[in-house]
Amino acid sequence: MKIIIQRVKKAQVSIEGQIQGKINQGLLLLVGVGPEDQEEDLDYAVRKLVNMRIFSDAEGKMNLSVKDIEGEILSISQFTLFADTKRGNRPAFTGAAKPDMASDFYDAFNQKLAQEVPVQTGIFGADMQVELVNNGPVTIILDTKKR
């Protein structure tokens, strides 16, 4: 899995002009699923995400997790994280998991994440418009194959 983590003051996702998911302070996740991803990748990602200390404490240090601040997560599927840009000018996306596998894996990821913190989502494979107010900004890349 490849996940772009953005610390946000608020975020929302809309599909065809209708708000699908909306959060206040928390994390916006752009989630890509790879063909080799397994249950252990899912567990690792959830554990890291809910415990990653990237929110400021009273002294201004990044010392609090999304769980500590009682924040929320907006999770958006993003197969383009597996783009291959080595040849030509058009990215190839053959490195991403096939849609059926990726959809099931993304759903399982969100369900497991929702056991820890409130989660809103987009719709897998939909054309979505994502709006966010970055906080920091703080943007982190999590790759479950690099641990």
From Swiss-Prot:
Gene: dtd
A single MF term (Gene Ontology): tRNA binding
Domain-level remarks: A Gly-cisPro motif from one monomer fits into the active site of the other monomer to allow specific chiral rejection of L-amino acids.
HAMAP family: Deacylase_Dtd
Organism: Streptococcus pneumoniae serotype 4 (strain ATCC BAA-334 / TIGR4)
Name assigned to this protein: D-aminoacyl-tRNA deacylase
Localization terms from the record: Cytoplasm
One matching Pfam family: Tyr_Deacylase
Ribonucleoprotein found in the keyword field: no
Physiological role: An aminoacyl-tRNA editing enzyme that deacylates mischarged D-aminoacyl-tRNAs. Also deacylates mischarged glycyl-tRNA(Ala), protecting cells against glycine mischarging by AlaRS. Acts via tRNA-based rather than protein-based catalysis; rejects L-amino acids rather than detecting D-amino acids in the active site. By recycling D-aminoacyl-tRNA to D-amino acids and free tRNA molecules, this enzyme counteracts the toxicity associated with the formation of D-aminoacyl-tRNA entities in vivo and helps enforce protein L-homochirality.
Enzyme class: hydrolase
E.C. code: 3.1.1.96
GO cellular component, one term: cytoplasm
Example of a GO biological process term: D-amino acid catabolic process
Motif position, Gly-cisPro motif, important for rejection of L-amino acids: 136-137
UniProt-listed PANTHER family: D-AMINOACYL-TRNA DEACYLASE 1, D-TYROSYL-TRNA TYR DEACYLASE
